[in-house]
Amino acid sequence: MTGLNETDARILVTSRHLFLWPLAETYFKNAEKVLQDCGVCDSFGRLLSTGLQCLYSVLMDTKMEPRVELLTRKRICEVLLSHTVEYADVEAILNRALIIAEQHNLTEYKFSLQLLLSRVFCRTSPKAAKVLLTRCVREAEEYAKVAEIYHSNNQSNPHRWVYEFLLATLEFQNVSQVANSIHNYANHHKHQHLQLLAMILNQSLPMDEISTDSDQISILCLVTQIAQCLRKGEILLAREILPKIHSKLESETFVWPSSYIDFFIDDTSKISIKWMSINQLYLLIYLISGFCYISDSTSGRASRFLQEGLRITGDFKHQERCVLEYLESQKWINNITKDMKYYLIATYLSRSRLSKAERILQSTEDDQTGFLGILKGMYLQKRGDLKKAEVHYRETAKNFSFRTDTFIISTLNLINILEDSAAASRCLESIEPLCNKHEKKIFKLWLLVLKVIREGPQVHQSNVLPRVIQQSSEYANTQLQYISLTELSERFGKLEHAEKMAISALELAKKSKDELWCLISGRILEDFYRSVQKYDKMRQQALENSAYSKLIEDIYSFV
């Protein structure tokens, strides 16, 4: 057997990475498959550890080229950051790689390493991350300017690093500030996809249809437009967009290759943004679709969308390829399942399906948002247990850690049931500024109705209620329509309009199949017929009311 000469031996040793790099990637690929199929388990850990050992073996080669060492260290750090929290090890490995990049003037490699280092600092030292990324943005901008002047033949567009670093600052900087920085830079350099990304981040998309060749970007734009509508309470406009999303999802040509969405700077360079997998997307669309119909109790769509969403959460399959993303995905699925349950409870309560709402309430764990406290209060209020409902509303309203929306809703509900008129008036005064300046105009309408109810049955105030009825219809809020119609009917007394308002409320309740509001509006109509001595209609309505009363006497304690 012929031995190797000195030159051959040197080539064999220094080429160690040519064998070990692909071998390591094979182990990593198999580890990812195990993660997707079985989650975090022993076999996953063994495969990951063996792959890392392959890369560490490359670093033991004393004669390897600097670029080989740099790339090996970079890959080790990518794997560690994806699957572990070994931040100290990653920082040490990266610092050595950065020295190599500086020594050999490998600027783009240096940028990629700094991006990884910023991820470490965001977890260990946010202040250091801010200092690092601020400097990196400035250096990347200077690098891009020089590259443009000298027409450098880079593999990637030099502007890419500016965007990468700006996006990394989202860890500690306001989204609006980052979006504005991206938009200004993209606008100056005419990067249309990145301008679009900035508008998505800032939730400032126009309501027109966005033309794009990417199914992923198209869906993301539609979801963002719906989010913009919901933020302002423009429910009907959000519903107009929903069919476009469902149509795209059902299309045979629909493509969703991964959790990452590509925004192109030019024909070859792109920024990949992590959003969600196709399985997560379907759940999100079911949640949004259900939410768009919650306020309209005349439609059963909200419960159908939310029930279907909850059904498929049981069959959810993770598609993440790293442990930290897998854990984030698990947290996400838990949160969206909880949100679906909450909104389904709200849907059942809006249609007076108390037994269904109660079953879900009993199986739902509390959270830190205060929403469950409001739902419990609403349930007790529907049951007629106003004292206990008041306790839930007060506890939720006085917790300053909750969102403004939560505070407003709990306070409005509290005002609605308070027996102490002076306390109710004080609550109205305190919450009025918040309702008036809030983006969701529906809060202002609720405030107006409660003020009118609390200020007494003067006829001259009734002109507020017709306006509320019209606007509540535009916002597709059935509960607000019920209250406004019945209150207005009682204010009209013996006038013909009183009958019309009560009949409208009753028809709305029948369409919603809401026995409680059928009974409430039916009793108002019965009292009206009695007051104007229409005894035949009164007796007919009394029989109908008796039937509704029997339907719900096991549920409502005050009937």
UniProtKB/Swiss-Prot annotation:
Cellular component terms (Gene Ontology): chromatin; cytosol; nucleus; Scc2-Scc4 cohesin loading complex; SMC loading complex
Cross-referenced InterPro entries: MAU2
GO BP terms: cell division; chromatin looping; chromosome segregation; maintenance of mitotic sister chromatid cohesion; mitotic sister chromatid cohesion
Locations listed in the record: Nucleus
Quaternary structure and interacting proteins, as annotated: Interacts with mis4 and rad21.
PANTHER family per record: MAU2 CHROMATID COHESION FACTOR HOMOLOG
Keywords from the named record: Cell cycle, Cell division, Chromosome partition, Mitosis, Nucleus
GO molecular function (one): cohesin loader activity
Function, as annotated: Involved in sister chromatid cohesion. Forms a complex with mis4, which is required for the association of the cohesin complex with chromosomes.
Name recorded for this polypeptide: MAU2 chromatid cohesion factor homolog
